[in-house]
Amino acid sequence: MEELKFQNRRDFLKKFTLGSAALLSLSSFKFISRTKKRNVTKITVLHTNDMHSHIDPFDKMDKNYPNMGGMIKIAKLIEQIRKKEDNILLLDAGDIFQGTPYFNFFKGEVEFKLMSAMRYDASTMGNHDFDNGIEGFKNMLPHASFPFICSNYDFKNTSLKNHTRKFKIFNKAGLKIGVLGIGIQLDGLVPKKLYGNTIYKDPYVCANYYADLLRNKYKCDLIICVSHLGYSYSDK
């Protein structure tokens, strides 16, 4: 087994705002082999959430975020980090859609194409990713080169059946990294006609089930939960 050492680098990217709540965060994980010769493998995890179709920066006259944010700027930042780091995992926690005319006119095509160009590894779905309905989301998937991981949404009775994953395992520098994705309760938050027959399952039960599966069956060295639940959550 290997020892996991976590190094938080929030100071490097304290407040890189994409939208009203979106943030690119960076963390580094160092795996140290328990042998006489201590070989260190560094994994860098980049994470975004709530991008809400903000392709361009805010207006330079904006009182709160002058000339800040936007997927174009974040793409440049990601490229800068890729030049310095070798083993990168780029993830998104949902609410990619809704918030600017880009979504109203192009229905998600622009967002998915940009994220594909940025080489995202995976994303989960937020409530606003249902804003064009299940069929609308499915129609945009050909523009995404990355998978959507939805561990607690059951799409078996919808057109999204077999178009998302429950988890995904990534291999980085000889390490197995398991990623699962958790979504929010849709009932009462999203109109029923938009999510259709999607079955919502308890996020805590699903997260623990897949974490156990990834750890014990698939022998992952690290497990990451990409969650759209926020810091404090209850669906009761």
Language-model-detected regions and their locations in the chain:
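Acidic, metal/ion-coordinating pockets
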Residues: 2-236
